[in-house]
């Protein structure tokens, strides 16, 4: 019997975009799929539109979220619990997949039954596919864990096909987090040795929309979201030590610095200071790096960064912690790669 792909889609107030997503699913050359849309309390016509599609094609089903807490990852996990697929794929209601997406992904996975998941190339767009002409990201010489530390991820939620059993075994999405859910998920996969390959020899099959309604600066640096980042970093440190990779703790310095500098810029100096003390005790930053970070904290605390010389000094002290990620920055004229590589 052909393998069934379960497409799990959280929805919330996407009446203007959800039809495009549904149409792209209906256009698949691989007919063996089901789509479970779990609605998170939409107040517009999103549910009505999905229900109209479901009435025309029984492979599409819509549910109201019943799990807690509210949020997209809760909807995704609840969908996984209800689905029947051999594979699971996550698709948001503002993204679009190419007609060959499922067929290429299934055939890639079935060529190697030992894989837990596979990563596929995707493109960024704003209004219509190809309008930005940018890769989501490209292959580089560094291993995936190194790139994850540097905030230069090659994998994100919609660009991956998971074997359902593997996704359940890894623990699914972490519902305690408000941000960095994708980052935390793939840290778990890489550190714990899940088997994967990148099939960047295949054509891009996903169009990932640049969201104009992204978090404002105030929302992005809200205390609860900063604590979510802290939780991810601490969990990564725990996993590294538990999996015999404590020697990689210093690579956390990029994440540590990003969290601390973000907290400092938003006035959360107590959080920044306590997290710096934790990072130094764990070996995530060296004595010299801690001193450099502490200098930046002092400049923010004194509000001297309002003035040019102090602001430039703070920027210079932060520069060594930049991860130089290229997500959404590489034009499609740059080759993405021409090989399938990973952790076989």
Question: What annotation goes with each model-predicted range?
Answer:
Residues 184, 191, 198-344:
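C-terminal subregions of glycosyltransferases and related glycan-biosynthesis enzymes
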Residues 72, 120, 140-229:
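Conserved nucleotide-sugar donor-binding catalytic segment
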Residues 100-132:
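Conserved donor NDP-sugar-binding/catalytic core segment of glycosyltransferases
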Residues 65-83, 104:
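Glycine-rich, basic loop-to-helix element that forms the pyrophosphate-binding segment
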Residues 88:
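Short aromatic/hydrophobic "clamp" motif used to bind/position activated sugar donors
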Residues 5-17, 21, 28, 38:
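A conserved hydrophobic helix/loop-capping motif in glycosyltransferases and polysaccharide synthases
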Residues 24, 31, 39-48, 69, ...:
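A conserved acidic beta->alpha catalytic loop
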Residues 3-6, 24, 34, 184:
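Cell-envelope/extracellular polymer assembly enzymes that use nucleotide-activated donors
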